[in-house]
Amino acid sequence: MLRRLLERPCTLALLVGSQLAVMMYLSLGGFRSLSALFGREQEPAFDYSHPHDVYSNLSHMPGAPVAPGGLPAPQGLPYCPKRSPLLVGPISVSFSPVPSLAEIVERNPRVEPGGRYRPARCEPRSRTAIIVPHRAREHHLRLLLYHLHPFLQRQQLAYGIYVIHQAGNGTFNRAKLLNVGVREALRDEEWDCLFLHDVDLLPENDHNLYVCDPRGPRHVAVAMNKFGYSLPYPQYFGGVSALTPDQYLKMNGFPNEYWGWGGEDDDIATRVRLAGMKISRPPTSVGHYKMVKHRGDKGNEENPHRFDLLVRTQNSWTQDGMNSLTYQLLSRELGPLYTNITADIGTDPRGPRTSSGPHYPPGSSQAFRQEMLQRRPPARPGPLPTANHTAPHGSH
C-alpha cells in the first residue's frame, strides 16, 4: 500500500515540496524560532543607529521611601524585577569631551563613597563587584566611570567599582592585578558576581546585564568595534568577563606570571575548560562594546614569553593563581566614584628589574587620586557597613 502511494506522481511531488518548504523555512530564520522552543536564547534585534543617552531614565528612579515624620520607611523591600523597567537598549558612547571628575560626581548623586550603589525601592537580585586593572590611563578611567555608573544603576543592581592600581614603573600585569582586586573586594562583602573589566571598554547596550551565570563563567565583551563587532576567535575570553567567586576559585583565579601584553586571556579560557566549566556568552547583538583608542603603553609591551607560558598551562594552572598570589597593599581609598586600591605586585623575574613601590608613572595619576579624595563626601555617622577601613598593610 505504502509502495503504491510513493509511486504516484502527486505523492512524490507533495513530499519533495514539503522538503523544500522546510529547507526554505530554516534558511529564512525559522531555526531561531525552533531553537526558542527548546530553550535556546534567541538573538534579539536592536537599532544601534538611534542610541539613547547614557543617563536616560535616571530621573525616573525614586529615592528611598520615607515614613510620616521624615523617618526612613521600615525594611522589607520587594525584590527588584528580573528585568529592570529602566533599560533602554543601545546607548550613546562618546569619547569627547572627556568629562571632568566634578561632572561625573554631579551626574551620579546616588553613588555612595567607594563607588557603591544599591536601589532605594527594591531589593537587588545581584551584588556585583566591578574590578578594573589600571595604570596611567586617567582619561580612560573617567570615560568608563561616566558611562558605567548610569548603565549599572538602570539594571537595578547593588554594585561597587574597584580600581586596582599597579604601583611602580615595572611591566604591567593585568591578570595579577585582577587577582588582587578579587581578594580585596571579597574582604569587603560576599559579592554574588565578579566582573573583570578592562578600563578602555565601554558597554553600548544596557540589556547586557552585569550579573553572573551560575552554570559557568561568562564572557560578555563578544562584539567590540575593534573586531568589527564580532568574536575574534571562539576561545577568546578578553575584555570583560564575569564569574561567581566559586567559579573564580575553582579555576584558581587568573595566572600571575603574564607580565606585559598578551597571552593571559587564552590561559584563562584554558583554565575554564580544565576546571570542568564552559564559557557562556550573551547574544552578539547585546554584547556590544566600544574601545577607547590609545597608543601602546610604556611598560605594557608585548610579552615575549606568552607562548611558552601557554604551553605549560595544563600543568601550571593549579599552582599559579590565587593560591600563589603575593602582593603588598599600599593604600585603600574610598573616593566618591570608586574604591582605589594601590598594590605593589613585584616585577617580572625574567625582565630588567625596576623600582617597585609607591612611585607613580609620569602624568596625572597621583593628582587624579588626590582630587578624588578631596571630593570625597563628608563622613557619615557610624562605620560604613560594606567598606573595610582597616585593611592590613603587608604581604598577603
Curated annotation (Swiss-Prot):
Record's bilayer topology term: Single-pass type II membrane protein
Residues in the Cytoplasmic compartment per record: 1-10
Location of the region described as Disordered in the Swiss-Prot/TrEMBL record: 341-396
GO CC, any one term: Golgi apparatus
List of residues binding UDP-alpha-D-galactose: 133-137, 172-174, 199-200, 229, 261, 294-296
Entry GO MF terms: beta-N-acetylglucosaminylglycopeptide beta-1,4-galactosyltransferase activity; galactosyltransferase activity; metal ion binding; N-acetyllactosamine synthase activity
Disulfide bonds: C80-C122, C193-C212
Stated name of the protein: Beta-1,4-galactosyltransferase 3
Organism for this UniProt entry: Bos taurus (Bovine)
